[in-house]
Each structure stands twice: as structure tokens, then as C-alpha cells.
């Protein structure tokens, strides 16, 4: 670490955020590598170090002898103030070197409210914010992550954008950048070659135009760019790179544990869930792979907790065999095994028995809506009876606390649906005391977490209006009034942040200037309540001549061109339209293992997809 940085660390809170040198961090001789890659997480160290994707791609890049990948996080206010006052640019943790001198600077876009942090970090690094102002080959500024499925609001700031999964595309891009650097190619030549890589989008090669009513007229390809850009996908999770060690922090982070990803994708088709569609098709790891990788992580990190990661852990086709294998050694070695993302409808007696053998923590389930009508609208395919039966099994197995996830602001929602959330939670409390085997002398705790629904791209609800702040606040008040028991604790999201998230989630390229102006007005850490500056954001919209209501309050007609329609994430637009119509008729769609819904993800040729050449269900009923 440079002495200039050491001096600054004497005056900040949590200096370990910036010191580097943790167990399993990668150090290389920079004179012996060709490429230097700064992997940036646009939030604080504690949040970024918890992110699995960063751990994976950090390992992918550092497995190359020609590349040194280093980590970068958004400095907290105290550190940033000192850095700016002392002219110290943003630096990488491993070397302490300024990232403006690196060959590639990559940002992961995990949530829309981090976009102003990306601009702040580029500015702190001394890197021009707009792609058109960066003339030299390096540094290439790359974005990726789940929010890249609609990158248009940040399109003016990125040279390239990774679509889909990055394990294989990262190496392809680094190979190209190395070749261009060694042969003296220009940035333009690099971009013209990169646009032919599956999963790479070059936004500067697409020109946007708008209709008189403000809707998108066209995104016209230039420079020979493809009309449609297809996401990258890992076809075989057993052969895909996965780290055998994680960097172990010196300080507590949000999720400080070993994490084993057991599969990608989801069979369920919940209509509000973006991840359930953009990560299709489902691709599982074998039990042998899961067991081997989990043991390696525990051995290399010293963690005493292992968390299994997926969109729905209990949907793994070999979940019981997997748990038996893991429990054999985690119980022996006193390792806590954590299973988030459990489904209400497959919480079996066998699963309860296996979970009872590991260290007990609270269970989390997601009914998502309080009434059956609303659950049918969102295609949750879970009944109240299944929720209560599952909670009863848990209580009989010795659990005393349950967390229930819900959403409010869903399409067609009424106050009756909101009251249904409280009523269902009350029935869960009753189920505890009506269970003869419940833990005597212990009170039940039911936590209700209620998120504000935000329509997202590549979901059946991408055309729907977002609920207004006034309506959401009324629903939050009604929920609190409807709670029947003190055993129930309710939490919900602040509505102004939901408004901004909704605008950016489905926004177009014109929002780049709004983000730039918001950053100039001091906006950053927009997901943090103590930093969120609603007035400054509204000022930015006004000065740029754009109305946030245009992006949130109106229902988009099916024929409208959407800002992400030129991107191909596998699931077809026709299928999403059909699912939207079914939602408005309260018609559910069975999950993939019951019957193929013809979503189109089988064309990606990866993983296991039950799709057949023909669409396996009658689609005329909702035309």
C-alpha cells in the first residue's frame, strides 16, 4: 500500500475497507502481467464483498497469467472527502494503484439505485464519465450484471456492456483487449471487434430516436452492429469456473459466509420476478460438484457457515440427496448449513427432518400476496392451505420464527388484497399455537416484509404502470391497521426510492443526462435512506425536460417499442404478452417441469429445458 493511502486511513472509520491484504486476496507482479482489470462494486466494501458474482469473476480474471484483477468499492463519505481534499484518485485494494491507469474498469449493476455511485467513482478516479470523451484504447469501461438487461439509462457512460453471464465472455473480451493493446489497435477497432462477441453490447453503435409523444421510435444500429444482441449463457454449471476460495475480510460484511451456487434459472414463472426470466433455462450442478466445491470453500476460508444459493433452493431436482450429502460432513464439522429461498409448496416432511439436523435459524417463505386471486394474477401457484401446512410442519419441527415476504402495488391489487396479507400472517400465528408439537414456553415470531412492486424488463408485467407513492402509502397504512396480533412485525420499503428505481428500470437513453445532472447536484448512495436526495433528483428531471411519471404511471401498449427490445435474453416477447393477458384473467401457468410454456429459452442451448419443438399448451384461450 502506498504511504499516501496509509496516511488517509488513520483518519477514517473502518480503515480495513480500503487496506486490502485479506486472506485469499490475489497479489501479482504487475511487471509480469499484460492487462490490469479493476472490478468495481458501486457500493461500500461490506455490501460489495458479500456479492457472489464479484467473487466468481475476480477468480475468472485472476486465473489468467496475463491479467491481474483487483477489487474497488465506493468509499464512504469520510474517505471520499479526504481523497478529494488530498488529490488522491480512486485506487484498487490489492495494489493501491489508481484505477485510471488500468486497462479495463468494470462495474457490476446489481440495482438501479447504484447508478449515481458509478458516476461518482469514475469521477473520483479521474476518468471521463461519458464514453465519447474517452478517446484512447484504455481504460475500457464495462458494465454488467442483472440491470444490464436494460442498460439504456447508463448507455452514454459505458464502452461495452456485458449481457447475461460473464464467466466465459470475460475471457473472450480480455483476449481481444490484449490483442488490441499489443498490436496498437484503436478503441474504435476494439469496439468494432467486440460487438461480434455474444453477450457484448456496444451502446455507442446504436442511435436512439423518439416519437412526438416521447415514446421510443427506433434504436438504429450503426457501424455494422447487429440488430439484436443475444445474452451470454453458461451451458454446463459442472464445468463452469467456480472459485475454490473467497477473499476473507478483516471486518464484518453483510453476508460473511461461504456460498455455494447450486443452480441457475428458475422453473416457476412468477410474473413479477425478473430473475426468474432472465436467468432461464435452469442449469443445475450435480450433487458431487456441490459437495466438492462446498468442502473446498470451507477448507480455504475457515468459515463455519455454508449458504446454498439459487432462486429456489428446494427446486433442485436432487435436493434430498444433496442435503443428505452435505449434512453428513457439515454436522460433523459443526458447520451451519443455510437454505434460503425455500418454496412453500415443496417443503416436505423429509426436508423438515433434514433441516432439523442443522443449526436452527428462522425460516423464510414468500407467499408474495395475501389473497388467492392476487397469487393467481402473479402466477405464484401457492395456496393459503399450503402456506399454513408448511408453517405447521416447521412449528412441529421446533421452529418458532417465520419470515414471510410479500409485495404491494401489484397489478389489479385492491385494499382487500392488502388486508389479506395481515390476515394470512395472523393465521400463521394461530397455526403455531394450534400445533400440538410446538415448542412449549416460546412465543412465535412472524415477520412480514412487504416490498413495493416495481415492473421490470423481460417480465410479463413490463407494460404495467407502477403504483403511485400516494397509493402505496395508503396501502402501507391499511396493512398496519389490519395486523391482528402483536406477534406480527411488519416492515416495508420507502416509496420515493421505489419511484426512482421504477424510472431507471424501464427508462430510455435520455435518462443518461438526468443521471449526470443528478450526480452534479450531489446525488450518490441513492439506496441509502440517509443519502437519498429526492429534491435533487426531481430538479435533475426538471432541468433535463423529462417527467418521471412518463416512465412509471402509464401502461405501455403491446405495440410500443421498449428500450430493451433489441436485446435477446431468451424469453420471447410473444410469450410475455401472453402471460400478461393470462394475469389479467387470473389464469395461472404451470411450472416448467409440469408442462412447457413455450417461453423460448430452449433456443439458448444451455442447461436443462423441458421445452419441446411445439408449444405445449393451448394459447388461444387468452387471445
For every predicted segment, state its role.
Residues 6-38, 45-46, 203, 209-259, ...:
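N-terminal [4Fe-4S]-dependent radical SAM core
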Residues 51, 252-288, 598-615:
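Canonical Radical SAM [4Fe-4S] cluster-binding loop centered on the CxxxCxxC motif
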Residues 40, 296-403, 408-447, 455:
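Conserved SAM/AdoMet-binding glycine-rich loop
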Residues 66-78:
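A short beta-strand-loop structural module common to alpha/beta enzyme folds
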Amino acid at each position: 500500500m502506498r504511504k499516501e493511502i496509509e496516511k488517509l486511513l488513520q483518519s477514517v472509520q473502518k480503515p480495513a475497507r480500503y487496506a486490502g491484504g485479506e486472506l485469499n486476496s490475489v497479489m501479482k507482479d504487475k511487471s509480469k502481467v499484460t492487462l490490469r482489470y479493476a472490478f468495481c462494486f458501486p457500493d461500500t466494501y461490506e455490501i460489495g464483498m458479500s456479492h457472489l458474482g464479484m467473487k466468481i469473476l475476480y477468480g475468472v480474471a485472476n486465473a489468467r497469467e496475463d491479467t491481474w484483477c483487483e477489487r474497488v468499492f465506493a468509499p464512504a463519505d469520510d474517505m471520499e472527502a479526504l481523497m478529494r481534499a488530498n488529490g488522491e484518485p480512486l485506487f484498487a485494494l490489492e495494489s493501491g494503484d489508481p484505477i485510471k491507469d488500468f486497462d479495463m474498469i468494470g462495474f457490476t449493476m446489481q440495482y438501479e439505485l447504484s447508478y449515481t455511485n458509478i458516476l461518482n467513482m469514475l469521477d473520483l478516479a479521474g476518468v471521463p464519465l461519458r464514453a465519447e470523451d474517452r478517446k484512447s484504447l484504455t481504460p475500457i469501461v464495462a458494465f454488467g450484471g442483472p440491470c444490464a438487461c436494460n442498460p439504456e439509462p447508463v448507455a452514454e457512460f459505458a464502452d461495452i456492456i456485458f449481457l447475461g453471464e460473464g464467466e466465459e465472455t470475460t475471457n473472450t473480451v480480455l483476449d481481444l483487449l490484449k490483442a488490441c493493446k499489443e498490436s496498437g489497435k484503436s478503441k474504435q477497432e476494439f469496439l468494432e471487434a467486440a460487438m461480434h462477441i455474444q453477450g457484448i453490447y456496444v451502446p455507442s453503435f446504436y442511435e436512439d430516436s423518439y416519437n412526438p409523444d416521447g415514446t421510443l421510435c427506433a434504436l438504429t444500429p450503426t457501424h455494422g452492429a447487429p440488430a439484436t444482441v443475444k445474452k451470454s449463457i453458461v451451458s454446463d454449471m459442472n464445468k463452469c469456473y467456480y472459485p475454490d476460495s473467497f477473499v476473507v475480510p478483516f471486518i464484518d460484511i453483510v453476508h460473511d459466509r461461504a456460498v455455494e451456487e447450486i443452480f441457475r434459472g428458475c422453473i416457476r414463472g412468477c410474473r413479477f420476478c425478473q430473475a426468474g426470466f432472465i436467468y432461464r433455462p435452469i442449469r443445475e450442478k450435480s450433487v458431487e460438484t456441490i459437495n466438492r466445491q462446498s468442502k473446498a470453500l470451507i477448507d480455504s476460508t475457515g468459515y463455519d457457515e455454508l449458504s446454498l444459493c439459487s432462486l429456489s433452493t428446494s427446486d433442485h431436482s436432487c435436493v434430498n440427496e444433496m442435503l443428505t450429502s452435505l449434512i453428513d460432513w457439515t454436522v460433523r464439522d459443526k458447520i451451519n448449513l443455510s437454505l434460503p429461498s425455500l418454496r412453500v409448496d415443496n417443503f416436505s416432511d423429509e426436508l423438515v427432518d433434514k433441516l432439523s439436523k442443522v443449526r436452527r435459524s428462522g425460516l423464510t417463505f414468500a407467499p408474495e400476496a395475501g389473497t388467492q386471486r392476487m397469487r393467481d394474477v402473479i402466477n405464484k401457484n401457492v395456496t393459503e392451505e399450503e402456506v399454513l401446512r408448511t408453517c405447521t410442519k416447521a412449528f412441529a419441527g421446533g421452529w418458532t420464527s417465520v419470515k414471510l415476504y410479500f409485495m404491494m402495488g401489484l397489478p389489479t391489487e385492491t385494499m382487500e388484497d392488502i388486508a389479506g396479507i395481515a390476515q394470512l400472517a395472523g393465521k400463521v400465528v394461530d397455526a403455531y399455537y394450534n400445533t400440538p408439537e410446538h415448542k412449549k414456553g416460546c412465543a412465535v415470531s412472524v415477520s412480514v416484509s412487504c416490498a413495493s412492486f416495481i415492473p421490470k424488463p423481460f417480465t410479463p408485467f413490463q407494460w404495467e404502470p407502477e403504483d403511485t407513492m400516494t397509493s402505496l402509502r395508503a396501502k402501507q397504512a391499511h396493512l398496519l391497521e389490519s395486523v391482528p396480533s402483536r406477534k406480527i412485525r411488519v416492515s416495508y420499503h420507502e416509496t420515493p426510492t421505489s419511484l426512482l428505481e421504477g424510472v431507471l428500470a424501464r427508462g430510455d437513453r435520455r435518462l443518461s443526462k438526468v443521471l449526470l445532472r443528478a450526480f452534479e447536484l450531489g446525488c450518490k448512495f441513492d439506496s441509502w435512506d440517509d443519502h437519498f436526495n429526492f429534491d435533487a433528483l426531481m430538479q435533475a428531471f426538471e432541468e433535463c425536460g423529462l417527467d418521471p411519471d412518463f416512465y412509471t404511471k402509464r401502461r405501455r401498449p403491446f405495440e410500443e417499442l421498449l428500450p430493451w427490445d433489441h436485446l435477446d435474453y431468451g424469453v420471447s416477447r410473444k410469450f410475455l404478452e401472453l402471460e400478461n393477458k393470462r394475469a389479467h384473467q387470473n389464469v395461472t401457468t404451470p411450472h416448467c417441469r409440469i408442462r412447457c410454456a413455450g417461453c423460448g429459452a430452449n433456443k439458448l442451448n444451455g442447461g436443462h429445458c423441458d421445452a419441446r419443438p411445439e408449444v405445449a399448451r393451448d394459447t388461444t384461450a387468452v387471445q
